Amino acid sequence: MWGGRFSGSLAEHMRLFNDSFPIDRRLWAEDIRGSIAWANGLERAGILQAAECQELIAGLRQVYQEFEEGLFLPLTSDEDIHTAVERRLGDFIGALAGKLHTGRSRNDQVATDTRLWTLGALKLADDLIRDVQAALLEQAKAVGEAMLPGYTHLQRAQPVLLSHALLAHFWRLDRDRQRLHDATKRVSVLPLGSGALAGTAFAVDRAALAAELGFTSISQNSLDATSDRDYIVEILAAIALLGVHISQLAEDWIIWSSSEWGFVALDDAYSTGSSLMPQKKNPDSLELARGKSGRLIGNLITVLTLLKGLPSAYDKDLQEDKAPLFDAIDTLSLTLPVVAGAIRTARFNTERMESALDDAMLATDVADELVRRGVPFREAHHIAGRLVREAEQRGVGMRQLPAESFVAAHPSLTDVAGLFDFARSVAMRDVPGGTAPNAVRDQLIAAQHVLAEG
């Protein structure tokens, strides 16, 4: 493909070093689609005769069939997917294959292939995330008005509905979906026709190419188009954050599944045992999901570091952009179905959750009631805090303090028995986005609409 300038061949270790076919071979379908569109473009530009174009396309379809059926046999001379396809095309149709690359560079070719592949990968990622969301929504609907302690700093804070806690992860994942969806318009930009860096010298209709390949726009600057990998960074950043959200979900559930908490039990299908300790049931599905987030963050850092030192236009360093992108999508494809399955099959111990609720978690309700009785909140906060301390010193729950303690704390606290009701505390948070049953019902409806809209 490029040997005319050189008098010798590559050293064997340099050939192996330069070879990207093991990585970019998965772009075979996109490469052939792009080549068919390019052949049509060359015909429209008068570079190819109609019969030549038809023969090229027929040959490309033969190559496509070989890949599709797993029959394609690479040669050591196939340094990348582009040379492999063109070489095999030549086997089928002879010298005419040499006309296909007219006006095209591997620089704009690989940029086009990768964008085409990424558009398909974004749809896959969306489906995978939606499935995890659906699993969370199914469980949130099933648990009714079960309550558990809500935690801040891993300390018991206030009671919340279990459904509310589950939906918190739903909305995080929805933001991840939105970020990936928003990136689509920046992926769907056609670089084909940009040549190596200066643009093709032939009058190819780039808008027609974009329409044929399903791109929504064409690039505006050929030098930028051949080196632009912003969209990969953007997608890897969104996926890294998705990984963090999955890790946070996993961390919550790993803690909940411990013997000390006992709030949730994972199904055997998503747990493993110990080679030494027969009693162990480990939440390895979620631990591995938590661990994969580091890999996803690493992929982002790899590409950012790759791009940092590059001058304008294409450099061979960019050959290293695809492995992190492919790995990110592969990791999601492996991880998210496991997470969805672990969620769907989990069993919640709602009695254990509700038994973990304690009176101190209602201290805010005492302060809120004082505010309703005309006490400034800061003073009310201080009064409630003193009552918590007194209960701790006596070794009792707040509700077990004598009536005199409440009246001594503030004269208005003459009837407080009704405050020590966890269901009441939850019901009082009846604002949009709150944990009250009414608010959570609205949230469930909103979540259902999000999934229905696709």
Swiss-Prot record:
Single GO cellular component term: cytosol
CDD domains: Argininosuccinate_lyase
Any one of the GO BP annotations: arginine biosynthetic process via ornithine
Main localization of the protein described in the UniProt heading: cytoplasm
Reaction catalyzed: 2-(N(omega)-L-arginino)succinate = fumarate + L-arginine
GO MF term list: argininosuccinate lyase activity
Compartments in which it is found: Cytoplasm
Matches recorded under Gene3D superfamilies: Fumarase/aspartase (C-terminal domain) (1.10.40.30), Fumarase/aspartase (Central domain) (1.20.200.10), Fumarase/aspartase (N-terminal domain) (1.10.275.10)
The EC number(s) this enzyme carries: 4.3.2.1
Keyword entries, A-Z: Amino-acid biosynthesis, Arginine biosynthesis, Cytoplasm, Lyase
Pathway it works in: Amino-acid biosynthesis; L-arginine biosynthesis; L-arginine from L-ornithine and carbamoyl phosphate: step 3/3
Recorded superkingdom: Bacteria
The protein's enzyme class: lyase
Protein family membership: Belongs to the lyase 1 family. Argininosuccinate lyase subfamily.
Protein name: Argininosuccinate lyase
Organism listed in the record: Herpetosiphon aurantiacus (strain ATCC 23779 / DSM 785 / 114-95)
Lineage: Bacteria, Bacillati, Chloroflexota, Chloroflexia, Herpetosiphonales
